[in-house]
Curated annotation (Swiss-Prot):
The keyword DNA repair applies. It comes from Kosmotoga olearia (strain ATCC BAA-1733 / DSM 21960 / TBF 19.5.1). Homotetramer. Forms an RuvA(8)-RuvB(12)-Holliday junction (HJ) complex. HJ DNA is sandwiched between 2 RuvA tetramers; dsDNA enters through RuvA and exits via RuvB. An RuvB hexamer assembles on each DNA strand where it exits the tetramer. Each RuvB hexamer is contacted by two RuvA subunits (via domain III) on 2 adjacent RuvB subunits; this complex drives branch migration. In the full resolvosome a probable DNA-RuvA(4)-RuvB(12)-RuvC(2) complex forms which resolves the HJ. GO terms for biological process: DNA recombination; DNA repair. Keywords: Cytoplasm, DNA damage, DNA recombination, DNA repair, DNA-binding. Its main location: cytoplasm. Residues 137-141 are annotated as: Flexible linker. Gene3D superfamilies: 5' to 3' exonuclease, C-terminal subdomain, DNA helicase RuvA subunit, C-terminal domain, Nucleic acid-binding proteins. Signal peptide: none annotated. This is Holliday junction branch migration complex subunit RuvA. Transmembrane segments: none annotated. Has three domains with a flexible linker between the domains II and III and assumes an 'L' shape. Domain III is highly mobile and contacts RuvB.
Amino acid sequence: MIKGVEGEITEISGNEVTLKAGQFYLNILCSTNTIKELSLSAKVHLLTYLSFSADRAPEIYGFKDRAEYNVFLMLLKANKIGPKMALKILSATSPEMLQKMIASKDISGLSRLPGLGKKTAERLVSELYDLVKDYAVEFPKELSDVSEDAVGALTALGFDMTSAKLAVNEVLKEQTVENTQELVRKALRKLNKTR
């Protein structure tokens, strides 16, 4: 198996790059996260996954970031998730956020990702939870009622559960808040910065 390739980027098109490695030109499929970090003529090292299938030519998947590579491999452990679907999922969110969604059992947030419906999201949680449970987002005990109300308000505004929990936790770590309204307002500022 090819664990990685090193060479010069000669073309970027959609989610595919062409990399010149010695005398070879390799077409490598990448997530949007990896594509954003690449530029033409740049010399790069990509971690790779080689996929074989009876009904199509071999495909190489490339990752600039080890965390994304590891989450890609983790996704392949789930039933009915192939490399193309795993790449599509990783193109829609960060590896860290995906792990937090699975660990927090955020079915709603997961099912909003492209290609994932409610059943697939539930399957991901049931099959991969043990691998990511340390990433679960929890609230400090003393403010859990206010925090839960704030998360409820943020999800009603259209934010996914995991993003809402992360924003609320960040606010609570940085400063004290008087009530739910103040917490929602400050969390909204954080969420709007990341959009």
